[in-house]
Design a protein with these regions (language model features):
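Ser/Thr-centric signal marking residues that sit
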Residues: 36, 76, 104
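Catalytic cores of alpha/beta
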Residues: 40-50, 58-68, 82-100
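Glycine-centered flexibility sites
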Residues: 1, 13-14, 80-81, 94, ...
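Generic structural "secondary-structure junction" signal
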Residues: 4-6, 11, 84, 105, ...
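Glycine- and Gly-Pro-enriched alpha-helical subdomains that act as flexible
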Residues: 1-62
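Short beta-strand/loop segments at the ligand-binding rim of alpha/beta enzyme cores
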Residues: 25-33, 66-79
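C-terminal helical cap(s) of enzyme catalytic domains, especially alpha/beta-barrels
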Residues: 67-71, 88-93, 100-120
Length: 120
């Protein structure tokens, strides 16, 4: 699949143009996901035919409205500010996927050096 993030959308000139470009340049791709930050972008992603719409950093109320707009026409993913405290509330809204950076943000760092590594 292809994920279109804000920088791709900005470079293409909008959600619709980014989705069209992805379909043109990568016709073999099975799914196109669009990262959205507001309800206008959600509407554009639906109209453009996105397969998955990511609801990024939205409040639960905004997510609920986005899901009404999408109305089953695309799979949905919520992302941003997902915590163990709010994930149950958010999943009850009916999104298909939840992504969370919290899983890796607090992972301990491994101090590793390859200085003394020798080629075989």
């Amino acid at each position: 699949g292809v994920m279109l993030k804000d920088n791709h959308i900005d470079a293409a000139g909008g959600v619709k143009a980014a989705v069209e470009a992805a379909k043109k340049y990568a016709p073999f791709v099975r799914k196109i996901e669009v990262e959205t930050e507001n309800l206008d972008m959600v509407r554009e992603a639906v109209e453009a035919g996105a397969d998955i719409i990511m609801l990024d950093n939205m409040t639960p109320d905004e997510m609920a409205e986005a899901l009404r707009i999408i109305d089953g026409r695309a799979e949905t993913e919520c992302s941003g500010n997902m915590t163990k405290e709010n994930i149950a509330t958010i999943t009850k809204l009916g999104v298909d996927y939840v992504s969370s950076g919290a899983l890796t943000h607090s992972a301990p760092i491994l101090d590793l050096s390859l200085k003394h590594l020798r080629a075989l």
